[in-house]
Regions:
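Alpha-helical interaction segments
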Residues: 47, 61, 104, 169, ...
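A short, compositionally biased
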Residues: 131, 152-154
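Short aromatic-glycine-(Arg/Gly/Cys) micro-motifs in beta-strand/loop hairpins
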Residues: 154-160
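Hydrophobic side chains in beta-strands
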Residues: 136-138, 149, 159
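Broad, structure-driven detector of short, well-ordered beta-strand segments within folded domains
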Residues: 143-150
Length: 229
């Protein structure tokens, strides 16, 4: 199911999960997709950040949407149906995606504050993960999902923890577009790391072809072919 970036297919995947979650009695919000940003709007934010946005992220803002929101919540259903999810994916209860050009400066303010006050030591392995990142999604538990700005792994999507998660600094996609397509194919579970971790495969990142993803599709009543173009 690994696929090249296709925004229409990406939307199809997200809407399919909203449909399945709603059918179960879960809570959902309509997928929100705002119009693309202009070159001038992007350059204005880049000037304040002090760098050019990573290319895959920049292209999505410019060609597809300047702001997107996706959300579902299955917690109450799962409390009443405690055996619905098998053990290997039992930590899943919601899915949330929220990114936008309008959020970048706020998230950079958060990142810079944490770096200065809590993680200032670039020579420390844990602290270093908070340096030279472009935060684009805030996770409910206070963690972030970011894009690497260091030259060695530039453009990769990385999980950034504030409280000692073993997944701190873990790369979960080679680039933003791959991240969107693969994460959408499992319904954007989380974004807390314990909700996407069942779908993580070493050297592949979030992997919609893994065994746990097939289990997830089965319990939701999704035929994997429905997630294809």
């Amino acid at each position: 199911m690994i696929s090249i970036f296709n925004f229409e297919l990406f939307k199809k995947r997200l809407n399919l999960f909203l449909e399945k979650i709603e059918d179960l009695g879960g809570e959902v919000e309509p997928l929100t997709i705002e119009k693309p940003a202009t070159e001038e709007e992007i350059k204005a934010v880049e000037a304040q950040l002090g760098y050019t946005l990573p290319p895959h992220f920049r292209e999505v803002l410019l060609e597809n949407t300047a702001h997107l929101e996706f959300w579902w919540y299955l917690y109450h259903f799962l409390q009443k149906n405690k055996d619905f999810l098998p053990d290997e994916i039992c930590g899943i209860f919601q899915g949330k995606l929220r990114f936008g050009l309008d959020l970048l400066l706020l998230y950079e303010e958060h990142r810079a504050g944490w770096q200065k006050d809590v993680f200032p030591n670039y020579e420390d392995e844990y602290d270093r993960v908070w340096h030279n990142k472009m935060f684009f999604q805030k996770v409910f538990n206070g963690d972030y999902i970011a894009i690497e700005l260091e030259p060695d792994n530039y453009g990769k999507v990385v999980y950034v923890s504030h409280d000692g998660s073993e997944n701190h600094g873990l790369y979960i996609a080679d680039n933003f577009k791959e991240f969107l397509m693969n994460y959408a194919a499992v319904g954007w579970t989380g974004g807390e790391d314990w909700q996407w971790e069942p779908f993580y495969t070493k050297d592949k990142g979030i992997d919609p072809t893994c065994e746990n993803a097939q289990t997830w599709y089965k319990v939701l009543g999704i035929n994997p072919k429905e997630l294809e173009g």
